[in-house]
Swiss-Prot record:
It comes from the Bacteria. Pfam families: YcgL. InterPro entries: YcgL-like_sf (IPR038068), YcgL_dom (IPR027354). PANTHER family: PROTEIN YCGL (PTHR38109:SF1). Residues 3-87 form the YcgL domain. It comes from Pseudomonas fluorescens (strain ATCC BAA-477 / NRRL B-23932 / Pf-5). Gene3D superfamilies: YcgL domain. This is YcgL domain-containing protein PFL_1496.
Length: 97
C-alpha cells in the first residue's frame, strides 16, 4: 500500500514534523494539535510504502497512523541524541588546579 504524504515542519519546535496524506492535507489533524504545532510549513512530499526506510520513524507505525487518524506526528529527538558531547579534557581545561 503506497501513500503520497505531505510533510510539514513546525515553526515552534525544531525537528518536529507532521505527516499527512497529500489528498487530505490537514483536514483530519485535530485543531488543538495544530495550535500547539504552529502554522505548518510545507517541507516536502514523499511516497511512502512498507518497504521504504525512514531515518527516525518506523514506517509501519507512520502508515498505520495515517490510515487510522489521518496524520503522524514526529517528535524531536531526545536532547542527548543531538547534543555533542565534549571530551573530558576539554570540559576540565579551565578548572582551577
Amino acid at each position: 500500500m503506497k501513500r503520497i504524504c505531505s510533510i510539514y515542519k513546525s515553526p515552534r519546535k525544531n525537528e518536529m514534523y507532521l505527516y499527512v496524506l497529500k489528498s487530505e492535507a490537514l483536514e483530519r489533524v485535530p485543531e488543538n494539535l495544530l495550535l500547539a504545532f504552529g502554522k505548518p510549513q510545507h517541507a516536502f512530499d514523499l511516497v511512502l510504502s512498507p518497504e521504504r526506510k525512514l531515518s527516525r520513524e518506523d514506517i509501519h507505525q507512520v502508515l498505520e497512523n495515517l490510515d487510522k487518524q489521518g496524520y503522524h506526528l514526529q517528535m524531536p529527538p531526545a536532547e542527548d541524541e543531538y547534543i555533542e558531547h565534549l571530551p573530558e579534557e576539554l570540559l576540565r581545561r579551565n578548572d582551577p588546579v
